[in-house]
A protein has these predicted regions:
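Non-cytosolic membrane-interface motifs at loop->transmembrane helix junctions
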Residues: 78-91, 136-147
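Alpha-helical transmembrane segments in multipass membrane proteins, preferentially the mid-helix core
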Residues: 37-42, 98-100, 153-172
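Membrane-embedded alpha-helical segments of multi-pass membrane proteins
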Residues: 26-35, 88-98, 115, 128, ...
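Aromatic-anchored segments of alpha-helical transmembrane domains
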Residues: 62-71, 119-131, 181-192
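Membrane-proximal helix-loop-helix units in multi-pass membrane proteins
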Residues: 101-162
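Membrane-interface transmembrane-helix boundary segments in multi-pass integral membrane proteins
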Residues: 13-31, 176-183, 193-233
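N-terminal topogenic module of multi-pass integral membrane proteins
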Residues: 1-53
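Membrane-interface helix-boundary motifs at transmembrane edges
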Residues: 43-56, 104-112, 163-175
Length: 251
């Protein structure tokens, strides 16, 4: 039985390879963006309970894909056992922990908007530029499939929250996202300090760009994520204005 699952999650089941900005990369992006848009449009006129149920399902998928990964990693030859790198010290994995809290517990309503925006921003950044994460593996091996689907569910959950009107963005409160990014920075620094394995969580220890020094990476990471948050806000206001002029929608 173990041999079957090892084969199922093996990288060696295909001669195909996925690379940055190739047809397979764009295929995953098309599926995720297209599916998100479709769900947004299909449920736009549905009841509030139907929308809430959909958001709950995606919250379950986010945490399910994250936690389930720790059980499946030992069966995949993408990993040599359970990888500590998947612990919640990166912004995307931290969001996996935060999503259930803000979705299911009213006590966390105060940070729900920030978690939604950071979920969209972080997943969008990874999906559009996963960098060396697409290291020539087969496009449908476990490592690639799980990582894209996890980020896709995280992105979809965030976008649908905005589309269904679960929260409304206010640019005057974007400082909360900035504070959230700083908190994640401190948390990632703590993780990098206690796990001296070179994991480079949140990319704050070692530069991932040859033209930037290691010392400047914490600042660049904060500015980059906050910049994408500004893009999310800009898209939100732009789409809302378009909807107000042409189509009735919840955004």
């Amino acid at each position: 039985m173990k041999e079957f699952f090892t084969y199922l999650f093996s990288e060696n089941t295909s001669n195909l390879q996925i690379g940055l900005f190739d047809i397979w990369h764009f295929t995953y992006l098309g599926i995720i963006f297209g599916g998100t848009l479709l769900l947004s449009l299909l449920l736009q006129k549905k009841s509030a309970s139907a929308k809430e149920k959909t958001l709950r399902i995606f919250a379950y998928l986010v945490i399910g894909f994250y936690v389930g990964d720790f059980f499946i990693m030992p069966l995949s030859d993408s990993y040599s056992g359970i990888s500590a790198y998947k612990l919640p010290f990166n912004i995307c994995t931290i969001m996996a922990v935060m999503v259930p809290f803000v979705q299911f517990n009213p006590k966390f309503t105060g940070i729900k908007t920030s978690v939604i925006v950071l979920s969209i921003a972080s997943s969008l950044m990874w999906m559009c530029y996963p960098g060396t994460a697409l290291g020539g593996q087969p496009p449908f091996c476990y490592l690639i499939f799980q990582t894209f689907m996890y980020h896709g569910f995280l992105f979809c959950w965030g976008v649908l929250n905005l589309s269904y009107g679960a929260v409304k963005l206010d640019i005057r409160k974007i400082w909360k996202e900035f504070v959230g990014i700083l908190c994640i920075l401190v948390w990632a620094w703590f993780g990098n300090s206690i796990y001296d394995k070179g994991y480079n969580w949140f990319f704050i220890e070692t530069s991932i760009f040859p033209f930037l020094s290691d010392e400047i990476m914490p600042l660049m990471v904060v500015l980059s994520v906050f910049g994408v948050c500004l893009v999310v806000y800009g898209a939100y206001y732009g789409i809302r204005r378009l909807c107000t002029q042409k189509l009735p929608c919840s955004v």
